[in-house]
Amino acid sequence: LDPPAAYDAGGAIAASSQVDPTLLNALDGLPWYELPPPKSLGKEWFETWVIPLLKASNATVRSQVATYTEHIANKVASAVLQTVNRCKTEALMSPTAILMSGGGVHNDYLMARIRQKMSDAGLNLNILTDPSLIDHKEAMIFAFLGLQVLLGRSNVLASVTGARQDSIGGSIHLPSHMEHFQLPLQCRHINT
């Protein structure tokens, strides 16, 4: 890239470049996407599967950035659509909003592509990208997991983690000055 860039600020490179259809088909067709959850992406997966495709491609670096951005938008929109359809099939509450997080949220072009793809699929979800939510996502998740412990509910789900069974992970530690504190009735199973 000229000038060199560590990342595509706001998606400007992707927005001003052409998607390479051959590379996009190769990326979208990676076998990992067909695996059932739980699954996780990591640096090793990217280096093993994606980097070789990029190196073998005849596309310019700018086109590769546009193509990979489109690939991410395809896969995020597809995963959201699958989740919404599963919720409908299993008669679960149908989601009305989705919290997006991670560095990609700061890529305006990527977020616009995801919104467009979801709209094209008939999904009109409110995509939450509020920095006050995104920047504190992990704290909110751990507060939610702690609440599940207080309520005596499993917070480690086999369907998500691959564990053999659901379980309650974590513990509640109260300071000594709260030794006479009474937990709510639902939480009396907890040893403090």
Question: How would you describe each model-predicted region?
Answer:
Residues 70, 128-178:
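Glycine-rich phosphate-binding/hydrolytic loop that grips phosphoryl groups
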Residues 89, 172-192:
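Eukaryotic N-terminal low-complexity, Ser/Thr- and Lys/Arg-rich leader segments
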Residues 121-129:
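Short hydrophobic/aromatic-enriched beta-strand-loop microsegments
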Residues 96-107, 139:
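Glycine-rich beta-strand-to-loop/alpha-helix junction loops that act as flexible
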Residues 14, 101, 129:
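Thr-Gly-centered strand-to-loop micro-motif
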